[in-house]
Amino acid sequence: RLVTRYDSPSETSNRGAYKTLLIQIGPDVAPSIIGILKGRSFFENRENFDILVRVKNPRVARLMLPFLEDEEVASQVVEAIGRLGSGAVNATIEALDQMKEKESNIPVMENIIKILGELKGPRAVESLESLSQHSSERIRDAVDRALFQIRGY
């Protein structure tokens, strides 16, 4: 409900106050904020992503990862999780490890790998290396890029 008010065109003059309040509430607002990303450009969503990033809580990454399945917002979710920094590494590794256990959605797996590369978390190397022989060329290429970003070679 608060997110609806924050997003309402009639509340533009109070938007700053709503934004501050949403940041103070914390990770619980993430699913609602992610829900309003659809159909908007990254530019239009910059304030929404700023809220998600400023919450700076590993829970936000966990809450955002399922939205990688929605092609409409996936690239924006990749960008936002990448901005969360090291706090998002463990949740992202766990998501990748869960996907490896079953034959999964290749674009989603590719985005998770891309996030790990952007986060540059050395803890991800082992999980990524285990995918270096994956049957999908897209996954192998994403793994190579991510490992290069993490290691620098």
Language-model segment annotations:
Residues 4-27, 32-57, 62-69, 74-87, ...:
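Structural detector for internal amphipathic alpha-helices that build alpha-solenoid repeat scaffolds
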Residues 129-135:
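TPR/TPR-like (Sel1-like) alpha-helical repeat modules
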